[in-house]
Amino acid sequence: MRRTLKTLSPCLVAFLLMLTVAFAGNAQELQKKLEGLKGISGIEKLESDHYAEKYLVRITQPVDHKNPAAGTFTQRVIVAHVGFDRPTILVTEGYGAAYALNPRYQEELSKLLDANMVFVEYRYFLESTPTPCNWEYLTAENSAYDLHNVNQTFRELYTGKWVSTGISKGGQTTCLYRAWFPDDVDFSVPYVAPLNRGCLLYTSDAADD
């Protein structure tokens, strides 16, 4: 018995070393892929109790998507990685994204579907506020274009099914995003979405244009 344990010990150590190297390689692969995405900067590794890898990144967005002369700003995005072959949940937050930085945070659909998560802070909130802060460009349309840019950028990494979701104003954002870009995601799951008639009429007219 002792001889068997002595024989297995070096094998076990070698196996554990191989696992360590493999995990480190996967992490480096993801970070390199993030670094290679257009418009992505400020990549920071985050701790997570639920995801294999989690990063805070910033994506450069036009302040006004129809007027490049208005300048750019950086929008905060949290990327939680499960696998390149897994579905991706696009969280269309309606406010700030600070709570998603918590290591214990796990989005519900991401948990149910064993899916990646791309969590987008709404423009003009917290660290996604342009400088100078011109409120003229805080529109639902610009927000939808922000999400479209995020979607198209991260589709280079995650080529599977995409699901957009949000709660309250985030649910509203999910609906409006789908109105402007109906083909960006495969499913939209708003958790409560307060909308008024004026908003719906404006969105319908703008999307038709």
Model-derived segments and their meaning:
Residues 202-209:
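Conserved small/polar residues in nucleotide/adenosyl-binding loops
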Residues 112-127:
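Conserved alpha/beta-hydrolase
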Residues 26-115:
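Catalytic-loop region of hydrolases
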Residues 190-198:
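Active-site nucleophile loop of the alpha/beta-hydrolase fold
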Residues 158-167:
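Alpha/beta-hydrolase fold nucleophile elbow
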Residues 11-20:
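Bacterial N-terminal signal peptides
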Residues 171-182:
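Short glycine-enriched nucleophile-adjacent loop
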Residues 137-155:
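Alpha/beta-hydrolase active-site loop
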